[in-house]
Amino acid sequence: MAKVCYFTGRKTVSGNNRSHAMNQTKRAVKPNLQKVTVLIDGKPKKVWASARALKSGKVERV
């Protein structure tokens, strides 16, 4: 299962590191994903949920 938020679709995005000399190298910006158990179709299932989704109340935990 990919590390993508089940509720908001947030996932890893790419960006650049910039040195003082303005050299650039690729870096990954990862979301704060937590493994939570939720009810999906009446059955408990473990899914990835972003911290933002958890705090905003979009997730109904078991």
From Swiss-Prot:
Keyword Methyltransferase on entry: no
Any one Gene Ontology molecular-function term assigned to this protein's record: structural constituent of ribosome
GO terms classed as biological process: translation
Entry keyword set: Ribonucleoprotein, Ribosomal protein
One Pfam family matching this protein: Ribosomal_L28
Organism domain of life: Bacteria
Membrane-spanning parts: none
PANTHER family: 50S RIBOSOMAL PROTEIN L28 (PTHR39080), LARGE RIBOSOMAL SUBUNIT PROTEIN BL28A (PTHR39080:SF1)
Similarity comment text for this entry: Belongs to the bacterial ribosomal protein bL28 family.
Protein name as annotated: Large ribosomal subunit protein bL28
Species per Swiss-Prot/TrEMBL record: Streptococcus sanguinis (strain SK36)
